[in-house]
């Protein structure tokens, strides 16, 4: 039996969220979070419109160059995506300060995803949330059982479930949990890791990493996750967004 996600205006019911990860101005899907891996899938705005036309209610937009290097080389491409769609956009990648986060929220992004910045300064969560309630998602990317930061290159020693509970107390509106070890590999999910995070908090948990089949989507739904981010499986046509939304 599915535990069911917490009541939330963010995700009123379980949702499948297409990923639009941008590197050098193009959509890419990395394997295991490693630079130079994976495949390219074209123009970000075209991809975003494709998923909205297919029924997406939320888009997961990530600036990979920002995540790895902290630069804003993709700023124009990312802004074009936000302006082109009329659905919720959650944005992450290279957001290092409360000023960065607030500026994005002021210019049309619905939710900001804080990863490295939240680990380095947990108070940033409350600082942004005070001005923009229900708009801060804390990203916990796990590799080898610990939270990793700085483009998935540095270990922190933090346990994902324990970290999730801490950020809930800091004011996070949701947790994005990414299993980097299986990200982009199309080899399936590790639902026990997701379930640990879900059980640690009373805010929505968005699961990401490893989805390759509709059964993977169903498995993550049954953990009580509020939503699942799907990238490679959708781009490669393993299933359609409509099929996933019927799970």
Label the predicted regions.
Residues 15-19, 57-58, 86-90, 110-113, ...:
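Structural preference for beta-strand elements that scaffold enzyme active sites
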Residues 1-17, 244-247:
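Haloarchaeal acidic low-complexity proteome signature biased toward cell-envelope/secretome components but also
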Residues 24-37, 109-183:
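Conserved anion-binding
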Residues 62-65, 70-130:
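Glycine/small-residue-rich loop that forms an oxyanion/phosphate-binding "nest" at active or ligand-binding sites
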Residues 58-74, 176-187:
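Glycine-rich, proline-tolerant flexible connector loops at the mouths of alpha/beta enzymes
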Residues 70-90, 126-141, 187-212:
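Alpha-helix-loop-beta-strand connector modules within alpha/beta enzyme cores
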Residues 124-131, 221-247:
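C-terminal helical cap(s) of enzyme catalytic domains, especially alpha/beta-barrels
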Residues 82-112, 193-228:
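Catalytic cores of alpha/beta
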